């Protein structure tokens, strides 16, 4: 029981401190929305975009073996005799 109360107390103190102290002190975030939901949505959009742009360097013989976000299957210097999926 005592450990549960301690955890609750520490959590509540940390939540209060997180609201008191500013997150950005450089002034860059002055024009950003402070709504946490919109920040989460923005973060998820950035992750989705970066995932779309990622092309894994899988071993391949033809372009058809590569994922849709890769443009070609070609020899890449330093990867040995195998072809790799690449994004140009």
Curated annotation (Swiss-Prot):
Among its keywords, does the record have Signal?
yes
Q: Which keywords appear in this protein's UniProt record, sorted alphabetically?
A: Cleavage on pair of basic residues, Disulfide bond, Ion channel impairing toxin, Neurotoxin, Secreted, Signal, Toxin
> Signal as a keyword?
yes
**Function recorded in the entry:** Acts as a neurotoxin by inhibiting an ion channel.
The written remark on domains in the entry is: The cysteine framework is IX (C-C-C-C-C-C).
Give each disulfide bond as a residue pair. 55-70, 60-73, 66-85
What family, per the record?
Belongs to the conopeptide P-like superfamily.
Protein name per Swiss-Prot or TrEMBL = Turripeptide Lol142
Q: What start and end residues bound the annotated signal peptide?
A: 1-18
Q: Summarize the PTM comment.
A: Contains 3 disulfide bonds.
**Propeptide residues per the UniProt entry:** 19-50
Report one GO cellular component: extracellular region
Q: Which organism is it from?
A: Iotyrris olangoensis
Please describe the organ and tissue distribution of this protein's expression: Expressed by the venom duct.
Q: Name one GO molecular function term.
A: ion channel regulator activity
Superkingdom, according to UniProt? Eukaryota
Protein's cellular compartments: Secreted
Q: What is the lineage of its organism?
A: Eukaryota, Metazoa, Spiralia, Lophotrochozoa, Mollusca
């Amino acid at each position: 029981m005592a450990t549960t109360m301690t955890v609750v107390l520490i959590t509540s103190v940390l939540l209060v401190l997180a609201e008191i102290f500013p997150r950005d002190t450089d002034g860059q975030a002055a024009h950003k929305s402070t709504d946490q939901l919109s920040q989460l949505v923005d973060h998820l959009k950035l992750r989705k975009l970066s995932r779309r742009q990622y092309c894994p360097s899988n071993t391949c013989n033809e372009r058809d073996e590569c994922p849709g976000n890769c443009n070609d299957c070609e020899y890449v210097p330093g990867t040995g005799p195998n072809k790799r999926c690449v994004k140009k």
